[in-house]
């Protein structure tokens, strides 16, 4: 290196330094800042019940309650929105979940149903009906196609958990809980996380190969605001929407606080990982009736 530097003239050295600085500056300018929220859609395109963002296998983003309750909307990468389907009269979805075949599943909290949507025909049918469900709220799914559903009763501030098997049979797997809301499986599918919005608890369960849960433990306890949707990244960290505070808290698999990401809106209801590398987080905001997004350092668990 010393020999090379001696052979360079002062002018050549200065030109090389300027060029290198320009490359570094250009790289920094083009890179996106991490954990900084920005608008994805305009405000007031959805209802106050905007929820459950999910990507299909082709990378199309879907969100519930576009323009009025009882609909599913589509969101383009540039933030423009359009209507996908109207649900049967009286049905209102609160979440979207896709299986490995591309089928869409929706918790219909007004009809005590889990709905199925054929993405080719856009036909909506009842996959599971259970009168004992309070108001199915959020869903997650394992690689076998089993659904796990949170089921709160907001008036009585209680809740329960269901597993819906691939044949549509509902199995009550937990009772006597608080207002169960956000629900998520760890990347290895051995842990189920469930939060209680009013009681501000996040619980964890062991999950066996048949989808049975056991070993309930308190994973994390919050002191204020509310809790809503949750998602895991590829490393198993859990991202929790803090409804009313306008932040997303990231916890390690051991339940340790990692960071808190501020949003522009306050009533964040759910989130999903997406983008080319799975490192963009898309968030639904009920007070803004629209969506925000931010860049993350780790991709979602499906990437």
Language-model segments: which ranges?
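Beta-propeller domains
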Residues: 63-85
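A short loop-to-beta-strand structural motif that recurs across blades of beta-propeller domains
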Residues: 71-73, 113-115, 160-162, 201-203, ...
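A short helix->beta-strand "capping" segment at the edge of beta-propeller domains
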Residues: 30-47, 216
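C-terminal motif of bacterial Sec signal peptides marking the signal peptidase cleavage site
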Residues: 26-27
């Amino acid at each position: 290196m010393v020999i090379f530097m001696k052979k360079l003239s002062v002018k050549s050295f200065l030109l090389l330094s300027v060029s290198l600085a320009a490359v570094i500056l250009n790289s920094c300018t083009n890179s996106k800042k991490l954990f900084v929220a920005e608008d994805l859609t305009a405000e007031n395109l959805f209802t106050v019940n905007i929820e459950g963002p999910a990507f299909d296998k082709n990378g199309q983003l879907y969100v519930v309650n576009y323009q009025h309750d009882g609909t599913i909307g589509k969101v383009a990468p540039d933030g423009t929105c359009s209507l996908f389907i109207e649900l049967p009269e009286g049905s209102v979805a609160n979440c979207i979940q896709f299986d490995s075949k591309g089928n869409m599943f929706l918790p219909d909290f007004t009809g005590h149903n889990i709905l199925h949507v054929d993405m080719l025909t856009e036909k909506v049918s009842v996959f599971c009906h259970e009168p004992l469900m309070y108001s199915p709220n959020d869903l997650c799914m394992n690689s076998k196609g089993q659904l796990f559903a949170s089921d709160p009763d907001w008036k009585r501030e209680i809740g329960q958990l269901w597993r819906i098997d691939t044949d549509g049979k509902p199995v009550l797997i937990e009772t006597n809980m608080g207002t169960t809301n956000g629900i998520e499986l760890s990347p290895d599918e051995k842990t189920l996380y469930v939060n209680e919005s009013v009681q501000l608890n996040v619980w964890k369960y062991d999950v066996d190969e048949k989808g049975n849960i056991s070993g309930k433990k308190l994973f994390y306890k919050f002191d204020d605001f509310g809790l809503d949707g949750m998602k895991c990244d590829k490393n198993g960290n859990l991202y929790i929407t803090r409804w009313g505070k306008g932040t997303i808290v990231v916890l390690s698999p051991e339940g340790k606080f990692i960071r808190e990401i501020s949003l522009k809106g306050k009533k964040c209801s759910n989130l999903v990982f997406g983008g080319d590398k799975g490192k963009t987080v898309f968030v639904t905001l009920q007070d803004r009736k629209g969506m925000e997004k931010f860049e993350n350092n780790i991709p979602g668990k499906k990437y």
